[in-house]
Amino acid sequence: AAPALLDAIAKEAVRRGLREFNPQDLSNTAWAYATAGHAAPALLDTIAEEAVRRGLRDFNEQNLANTAWAYGTAGHAAPALLDAIAEEAVQRGLRDFAPQALSNTAWAYATAGRAPPALLD
């Protein structure tokens, strides 16, 4: 029953679009599907597109880290999103990230096989 429910939620979210979701909603949704190990590629594509479209300045550091972690955990390629997260994190300064957020973010990029220049400079 749970996989069917997760499929139905993902389908409905994609159908509606995610413009009403705030940054935490986007982050938590990606995190939930990754944590559940439930593949929802259309939903993850839609979350990535919406986050990149609106920009990440309203995401807090935990939202950024959780989103990166979710895509790494899900094994879902979203290069534009991961590049945008890296740019936003560096622009803010990584000193504002909690240690757990830093480690989750580093893990996500390593798992995704991405080494964005913004994080390496």
Question: Which sequence ranges carry the predicted segments?
Answer:
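Eukaryotic RNA-binding helical-repeat scaffolds
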Residues: 1-121
